[in-house]
């Protein structure tokens, strides 16, 4: 079992699956230079007391400690600790004592981003808990130019939503929210205005699923749907699920969630003074823009392919994948017969840009990921150009082809039964995959024979 040490915001792990490969994760949440140490102990009387005694004997200042049952060994508990940065000179001997004298399993990590390192990535859906609260902006705090910056009631409300997201853990139902009348009015304005455009501007997949969301998830002008209801609906359609988040995540963390068919979703709504504008993703953007397409099997698979491609990818490729995501999932157009329709959530949740993108003003180019990945884009204005996909299936194959160019010493696949990402870097893993494929092919052949007869 791997152990984890986090020092000065840099986390890296040796993965037994990668031989001598090392992985790292950069994280700026720990600004005081403290060292984070994760270790596991057998569930027995006095086990933690031995560790605390070891720290005391070596004059180590323990500033924070959390515990939880181990997800890998039901007979152990995991402890997450912060140690004073002055611990560094004796850290090696402490880890040795934890292992040899106390019998702890220490999650050991390299503390440098070295050559041939692989960025850390979640291997289980539960590990999304590790970074879900490491938001880059907004959350409970607002920039001075935010429409709600000077509104103390709105800021307090945002803190309530942020607290829900911070306290959420995988497997829990998403807490239900009683939205205010003002919030419902804001939603109603956005809902009514956008719905009028969908029939002529949105893609078939969006228009096909939208009535089902109205029927089963409470998508109405006078009602803001609950994330838990929508998440349950998504799981029955494509296996995607929603997870509340307080604000913007890093590209690596956000894309990593997609690999597990998890969409990090905001629960708050934009400020009522500007119902047709938001400087950040809000529940209008998430539910009206993203959710209908995540309910489509082909689009869900396409989105997951982007997420899987991001796992263990170098930083420069994360930037490319984030750009691909921007020009597809957020601002993508697709062919539909002789017409072009919008499928990007940024378009489907913006009244102005949804009209603009299908006018003669922007430039339209075919989706070529090698070029798309390097294209600059604006986050404050309408896009000067959009990329047009032939179909979601075609876009999915292009993502797979692009993923093959990413320099990483392994391939990955998602196992929906265990909700784990499997690293395919040895013959045993490949044999398991081959057996799985063989079983599926057998089912296919059997079904074809019955259809013919």
UniProtKB/Swiss-Prot annotation:
Which cofactor does the UniProt annotation name? Fe(2+)
The UniProt entry's GO biological process terms, in alphabetical order, are: L-phenylalanine catabolic process; L-phenylalanine metabolic process; tyrosine biosynthetic process; tyrosine biosynthetic process, by oxidation of phenylalanine
Q: By its UniProt entry, which PROSITE patterns does this protein fall under?
A: ACT (PS51671), BH4_AAA_HYDROXYL_1 (PS00367), BH4_AAA_HYDROXYL_2 (PS51410)
The enzyme class is: oxidoreductase
- Phosphoserine: modified positions: 16
The record's GO molecular-function terms, alphabetically, read:
amino acid binding; identical protein binding; iron ion binding; phenylalanine 4-monooxygenase activity
N-acetylalanine modification sites are: 2
Residues covered by the ACT domain: 36-114
Signal sequence, start to end: none
Q: Which family does it belong to?
A: Belongs to the biopterin-dependent aromatic amino acid hydroxylase family.
As for what it does, the entry says: Catalyzes the hydroxylation of L-phenylalanine to L-tyrosine.
Q: In its UniProt entry, what is this protein called?
A: Phenylalanine-4-hydroxylase
The organism named in the record is Rattus norvegicus (Rat)
Q: Which gene encodes it?
A: Pah
């Amino acid at each position: 079992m791997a152990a984890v040490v986090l020092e000065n915001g840099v986390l890296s792990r040796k993965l037994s699956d990668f031989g001598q490969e090392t992985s790292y994760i950069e994280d700026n949440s720990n600004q005081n230079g403290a060292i984070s140490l994760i270790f596991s102990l057998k569930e027995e009387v006095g086990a933690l007391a031995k560790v605390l005694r070891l720290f005391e004997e070596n004059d180590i200042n323990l500033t924070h400690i959390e515990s939880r049952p181990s997800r890998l060994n039901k007979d152990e508990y995991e402890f997450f600790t912060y140690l004073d940065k002055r611990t560094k000179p004796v850290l090696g001997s402490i880890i040795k004592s934890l292992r040899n004298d106390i019998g702890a399993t220490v999650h050991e990590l390299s503390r440098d981003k070295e050559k041939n390192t692989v960025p850390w990535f979640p291997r289980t859906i539960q590990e999304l808990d590790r970074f879900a609260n490491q938001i880059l902006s907004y959350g409970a705090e607002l920039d001075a130019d935010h429409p709600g910056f000077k509104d103390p009631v709105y800021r307090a409300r945002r803190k309530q939503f942020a607290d829900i997201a911070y306290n959420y853990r995988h497997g829990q139902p998403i807490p239900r929210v009683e939205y205010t009348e003002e919030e419902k009015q804001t939603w109603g304005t956005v809902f009514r205005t956008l719905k009028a455009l969908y029939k002529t501007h949105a893609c078939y997949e969006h228009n096909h699923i939208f009535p089902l969301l109205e029927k089963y998830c409470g998508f109405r002008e006078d009602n803001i749907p609950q994330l838990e209801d929508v998440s349950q609906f998504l799981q029955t359609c494509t296996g995607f699920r929603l997870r509340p988040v307080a604000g913007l995540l890093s590209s690596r963390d956000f894309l990593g969630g997609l690999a597990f068919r998890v969409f990090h979703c905001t629960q708050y709504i934009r400020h009522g003074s500007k119902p047709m504008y938001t400087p950040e993703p809000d529940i209008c953007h998430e539910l009206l823009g993203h959710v209908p397409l995540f309910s489509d099997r082909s689009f869900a698979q396409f989105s997951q392919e982007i997420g899987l491609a991001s796992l263990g990818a170098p930083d420069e490729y994360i930037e490319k994948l984030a750009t691909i995501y921007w020009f597809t999932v957020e601002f993508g157009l697709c062919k539909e017969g002789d017409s072009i329709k919008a499928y990007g959530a940024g378009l489907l949740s913006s009244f102005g840009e949804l009209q603009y993108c299908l006018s003669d003003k922007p430039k339209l180019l075919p989706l070529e990921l090698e070029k798309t990945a390097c294209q600059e884009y604006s986050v404050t204005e309408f896009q000067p150009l959009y990329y047009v996909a032939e179909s979601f299936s075609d876009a999915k194959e292009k993502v797979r082809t692009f993923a093959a160019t990413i320099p990483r010493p392994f391939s990955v696949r998602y196992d929906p039964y265990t909700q784990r990402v499997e690293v395919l870097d040895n013959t045993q893993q490949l044999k398991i995959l081959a057996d799985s494929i063989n079983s599926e092919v057998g089912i296919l052949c059997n079904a074809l024979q019955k259809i013919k007869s």
